[in-house]
Amino acid sequence: MGGGVYDTGMIRAVIDTNVFIAALRSSSGASFQIFMAADRGDFEVALSVPLLAEYDDVSARPDIGITIPPASIDAIIGRIAQIAHKQPIYFLWRPILPDPKDDMVLELGIAAGVSHIVTFNCKDFTQAAEFGITINSPSEFLTLIL
């Protein structure tokens, strides 16, 4: 199993914000299990400052349906930042995807040399294949890494 352009022998993936939010909403779904697998070192999460900021921003919205206390969310985000491959972004590919907010996810994937992007919006990432990146739903990706 390749890990992308910068092959470490392990799968490297970008986890979209919608998957992070799903993991915070429920501990019984594939999204939560993906973050548990990352914490165990089963694969490597690629992270950028903009994506980390989006995790923080979206998880703090009162209408998002998360019942975890803000301090716990901060600790979770801190842990993700601790275990992740931190990737600076030097080149912007915008606009490339139908939803401009998804561009930063693909840009991170390209810069970090990931093999996978995990998202609930698979149809919005059709151009990822041009960069050798596979788009997976959380359940598809979980099957791949376990």
Per-region residue spans from a language model:
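Amphipathic coiled-coil/heptad-repeat helices and related helical stalk/stem segments
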Residues: 30-31, 73, 101-102
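Short, active-site-adjacent cap segments at secondary-structure transitions
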Residues: 20-21, 52-54, 124-126
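PIN-domain endoribonuclease scaffold, especially VapC-family toxins
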Residues: 37-92
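Acidic, PIN/NYN-like endoribonuclease modules and their adjacent C-terminal/linker elements
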Residues: 2, 96, 110-116, 122-146
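Short secondary-structure boundary segments
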Residues: 17, 49-50, 120-122
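Short, well-structured N-terminal submotif of metal-dependent ribonuclease cores
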Residues: 1-47
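Active-site neighborhoods of divalent-metal-dependent phosphate/nucleic-acid chemistry enzymes
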Residues: 82-122
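Residues that scaffold the ATP/ADP-binding catalytic core of kinase and kinase-like folds
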Residues: 23-24, 58, 67, 128, ...
